[in-house]
Amino acid sequence: MVEKTGAEYEIFAIRYAWRDARRSDHFIGGDPHEGPMPMDYFTWVIRGSGSEGGRTIVVDTGFTAEVSARRGRTHLRCPIETMSELGIDPDSVDDVVLTHLHYDHVGNFHKFAHARFHLQTREMGFVTGPYMRYPKFGHSFEVEDVVGMVKLNFKGRVEQHNGTFELAPNITLHHVGGHTPGLQIVRVMTRRGWVVLASDAAHYYEHLQKNRFFVQAFNLGDMVDGYRTCERLAASPDHIIPGHDPLVMKLYPAVSPELDGMIVRLDVPPKKAD
């Protein structure tokens, strides 16, 4: 267990969409136990407490209803509008972390009129470089999202990082790559210790626990090294939050009974899986 020191934060996961899928959709090489394996889509909110009270950082911004319909996803709610349930006004958010620029992590960015967007330099280079001519890589990006980031960069609102960056006291960004060249994860100190928002460094708990590879990958070596980085940075395996696993909504408590299935808290210990 890593010793707790300094600023602590609350963390919330907002479930905004889902899709029906099979196990073979999520593991390279298929799966001998083929069966249903739905995928949830999340954005995350980090909110300061104590000395960092009032500070809000958003991690990823989801996708729009229009993109959802075109890609065959079930859109439940706008994740940015849902933040009002936490008392968050997007216009008051100063910092948005984009773990990478896939369509389900960067859509709705335009709803943050004043924020700075934090991503890895390698991710910006990837989406504006030669690999986008290949459908295997390019299909997970929305061109208008990429163009939007380029325009914001010209306006001085994109902060590009090379590796580890301290965004705030006890909040750090860490480059891992793998899924995309510029994928980054977020390490946050909470009341229960260091929590790692793994995003797509680990789509499901099973990827991490069994060293399985997700089907969409740029570099498999970096992907499995990313699992080890998540483990090294988190206080325990229970402190790692995968990016798309429906188990997250079952393991962590809802903010309120009315928000069950919509928003859960990640800064408290999880329930034990059945």
What are the residue ranges of the model-derived segments?
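Conserved beta-strand hairpin/beta-sheet module of binuclear metal-dependent hydrolase folds
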Residues: 10, 16-85, 185-199
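Active-site metal-binding loops of divalent metal-dependent hydrolases
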Residues: 16-17, 61-64, 101, 122-123, ...
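A short helix->loop->beta-strand "cap" motif at the edges of active sites that frequently abuts
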Residues: 55, 114-115, 236-238
